[in-house]
């Protein structure tokens, strides 16, 4: 029952995000399994740069308030363990250079979020967000593939995702239940 409740919260949260993006006429693709959104680095940044473009600032100004407002809603906030902003690069170039670039890009998005957060979050919501927000660079790890080939444009991205408090426990329980079911069927 506890597993169903937590899984239900995640499903409800993803549904609430979709609904709010639709109501704000924002074309945002949400990963059905994780609730993550991928922001196109080609819009956010010039190639090989970590300073936000004007178009990127405009995009973030529309998307981040909606995403954060839903996550900070009291019905979900208690379950929220982390809000993560993750930068990724394509597979060309040097790993360490790309690690620095991806970290700088993730930090640029996080910094932008806090520049304006008090205009759409209450003081308590802002405090909670500060306790939960992380910013990470992943270099060229986890590239995006299209038709078996690395999609360089899609691989250059910043993802915004959340993690629920009991998610790790649920994943462990799922593994145990799957192993138990397999053992019983043998």
PLM region spans:
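Periplasmic OmpA-like peptidoglycan-binding domain that tethers envelope proteins to the cell wall
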Residues: 44, 49-57, 84-172, 176
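Periplasmic peptidoglycan-binding/tethering modules of Gram-negative envelope proteins
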Residues: 1-81, 165-186
């Amino acid at each position: 029952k506890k597993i169903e409740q937590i899984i239900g919260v995640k499903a409800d949260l993803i549904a609430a995000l979709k609904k709010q993006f639709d109501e704000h006429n924002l074309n945002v693709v949400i990963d059905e399994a994780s609730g993550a959104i991928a922001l196109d680095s080609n819009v956010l940044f010039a190639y090989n740069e970590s300073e936000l473009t004007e178009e990127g600032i405009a995009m973030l100004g529309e998307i981040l308030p909606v995403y954060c407002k839903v996550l900070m809603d009291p019905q979900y906030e208690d379950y929220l363990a982390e809000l993560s902003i993750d930068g990724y690069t394509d597979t060309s170039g040097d790993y360490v250079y790309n690690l620095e670039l991806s970290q700088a890009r993730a930090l640029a998005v996080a910094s932008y979020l806090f520049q304006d957060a008090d205009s759409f979050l209450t003081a308590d919501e802002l405090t909670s967000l500060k306790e939960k927000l992380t910013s990470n660079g992943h270099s060229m790890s986890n590239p995006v593939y299209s038709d078996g080939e690395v999609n360089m444009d899609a691989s250059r991205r910043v993802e915004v995702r959340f993690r629920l408090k009991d998610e790790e426990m649920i994943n462990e329980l799922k593994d145990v239940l799957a192993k138990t079911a397999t053992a019983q069927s043998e």
